[in-house]
C-alpha cells in the first residue's frame, strides 16, 4: 500500500490574520479559509470552510489582547480536533499570561500553567512560540514545544549597525541571561538595571550596575508593555553619559501611554517584531517581521527536519 502523504494547511486567528498571511506567503502556501461567526451577545464561533481531515494544520494566533484571542484559539483547536486533523500545531508568536509563571504571593493562580493545560485539552498536539517570558513555561506542557528566539533576527540587525563602543543592557535582573547571550555574540560589555517597584508597572527607584559613559547602549528584553521601565532606563543612561540608547524587545504590547512615553524619551529607536499587531505607527519604532522565522520552522516541523539553528539565544 502506498504511503499516504500528509498535507500541511495554515490558518489564522482573526486578530493575527495579517501575520498569518505573511507566514503562509513565506511558507509558499495559501492561507486556509476560516469563517468567524459572531452572535449579537458577543459570543463567536470559528468554522473551517475546507476539509482538514488527516492533515497537519497550523493555527496562528497571538493571545493579546488576552482573553478573546485565547478563546478564539481554543475554539479553533477544538474544531480542528473534531474535524479529524491528524496533527494540530498552535503557533502562538506571543504567549500571553506568561508573567503568571509561578505563585509569587498567597492566593494567586499560576496562569501560564492553566493556559498550557487548556491548549492541550482543546486539541493542540504541538506548540510553536517565541521568546517566552519565562523559559520554564515549556515544562508546563506535556506536548512538544518549539521555543524560538527573536535573537536570530535581532542579532544580524544589530551587527549591521556597526556601532562602536557597544554595550548590551538588561532593564532588570531577570533579563541578565539574555543580555549576556547577546553580549557574547556581539563581543560587547554588559550593564544591568536594578529597579524597585511600588506595584505592577510603577517603578520607585532604578540604578545601573556597570558603566555606560561613552557607550552606544542596546537594551534587550522579551516584551515592552507600558514602556515605563524602558524609557526610564534610557533617560537614566543618557544622564550617565551614554552616546545613544536603543532597545530590542520581541513583543510590542505597548499598552496605555507607551507610544507617548517612547516619543518623549531619549530612546533613539525601539526594534521589535510583528508578533502582536501594532496599535499605531511611530518613527521611533522599527518592526522586523517574524513571518519568515515561523515559516521556516513550520516547514521543518512538517518535514521532520531539525530546527536547532533557530535556537540562537
For each predicted feature, which ranges?
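PRPP-associated nucleotide enzymes
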Residues: 1-313
